[in-house]
């Protein structure tokens, strides 16, 4: 007789282990796609490219975000994606309380003494090393033009 004896215990054990392995592989597959960093970068570029002060928001489907002057990174359980900005550099407004306030709508004159002080804070923010931070809402982009300072804040 040619073939595997189906009544052998080791055949049943092997089939059982293979079934458990397949279920385990299926359970670890991501249930959602990786976040779309390109769409977020497009929102930033649209705001940065305009000639007038503007504000834009983009919903995020990520758990963590990393914003740099020239790139954005998003990650969730399904993976990590990155995208470069076409218009930059932009100013990550995550480490400075004053820049975050202006990003969220405060007039720049309420947080900074002059346009030069705003530009200095922007330069300092762009020098920092981007870090992964938890996402706590939509991506906000605000282009501010005030007293000779032209800066695009992202947070």
Describe these PLM feature segments:
Residues 2-155:
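Acidic, polar-rich N-terminal leader regions of halophilic archaeal proteins
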């Amino acid at each position: 007789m040619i073939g595997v004896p189906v009544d052998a215990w080791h055949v049943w054990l092997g089939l059982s282990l293979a079934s458990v392995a397949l279920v385990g592989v299926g359970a670890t597959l991501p249930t959602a796609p990786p976040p779309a960093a390109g769409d977020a970068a497009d929102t930033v570029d649209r705001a940065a490219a305009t000639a007038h002060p503007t504000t834009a928001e983009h919903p995020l489907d990520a758990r963590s975000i990393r914003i740099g002057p020239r790139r954005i990174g998003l990650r969730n359980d399904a993976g990590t994606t990155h995208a470069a900005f076409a218009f930059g550099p932009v100013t990550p407004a995550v480490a400075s309380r004053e820049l975050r306030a202006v990003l969220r709508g405060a007039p720049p004159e309420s947080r900074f003494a002059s346009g030069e002080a705003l530009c200095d804070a922007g330069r300092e923010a762009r020098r920092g090393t981007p870090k992964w931070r938890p996402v706590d809402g939509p991506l906000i982009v605000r282009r501010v033009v005030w007293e000779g300072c032209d800066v695009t804040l992202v947070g």
